[in-house]
Design a protein with these regions (language model features):
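Amphipathic alpha-helical segments used for helix-helix packing
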Residues: 94-116
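Amphipathic alpha-helical packing segments from all-alpha helical-bundle domains
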Residues: 69-73, 81, 115-142, 151-155, ...
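N-terminal intrinsically disordered/low-complexity leader segments
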Residues: 1-8
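Hydrophobic/aromatic residues within well-ordered alpha-helical segments
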Residues: 10, 53, 60, 64, ...
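Hydrophobic alpha-helical segments that form the core
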Residues: 134, 147-169, 178-187
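Hydrophobic alpha-helical connector segments
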Residues: 59, 72-99, 153-157, 179
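Helix-turn-helix
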Residues: 9, 13, 17, 21-55, ...
């Protein structure tokens, strides 16, 4: 392994360790020394990779923004099938990359008041609800989804996914539910 590859592996180890500790203990209760000890490496060496805990936080938020994606335009695919396939992809990706479960928990934490403002603003910059509202309205128009406030329905869809990911983060033995179960709450 080259030095460059070793450095990238070390960087990834720091990020994954920080992610796990931030989810477990919270951002403010996790010290740089805790992260360094868990990697393991010296605190001084960790600062060669990240100048501060907030820089590390921002890097994790940027990773979270690149996650498994968001709901987009379904094209000719019926909205219920599209959402079912979307959830299937999210669960599949998370099972292949277990840190994704922690990332869902982490991103929810970062969006809360009291977190460093730059990280909070960045975490809030992605709107998953608006495209989901459009998709639900299309499904309502086509008679696939129940009548009701599409914004509330979209928020409930995402809250369900968030809750599932949090449970799977806490219980490593939990299996992903059938995506159809989640989509069925929207159906007429």
């Amino acid at each position: 392994m080259t030095r460059k590859e070793q450095k990238e592996e070390r960087r990834k180890a720091i990020l994954m360790t920080a992610l796990a500790l931030f989810v477990e203990r919270g951002y403010y209760d996790t010290k740089i020394a805790d992260i360094a000890a868990a990697v393991p490496m010296s605190t001084g060496l960790l600062f060669h990779y990240f100048a501060s805990k907030e820089e590390l936080l921002l890097e994790l938020v940027k990773m979270g923004l690149q996650g498994p994606g968001s709901v987009g335009d379904s094209g000719d695919v019926p909205p219920d099938l599209y959402l079912t396939m979307f959830l299937g992809k999210v669960f599949s990706f998370a099972e292949e990359q277990p840190w994704v479960f922690n990332m869902f928990v982490f991103m929810a934490q970062v969006r809360r008041v009291g977190m460093p403002e730059e990280a909070r603003r960045l975490a809030q910059s992605v709107d998953a609800v608006a495209p989901t509202v459009k998709l639900i309205k299309k499904g309502q128009k086509d008679g696939i989804f129940r009548k009701g406030d599409a914004d509330t329905m979209a928020r409930c869809f995402w809250a369900s996914l968030q809750g599932i990911m949090e449970e799977m983060s806490a219980d490593k033995n939990m299996k992903a539910p059938d995506p159809g179960w989640i989509v069925s709450m929207l159906k007429a």
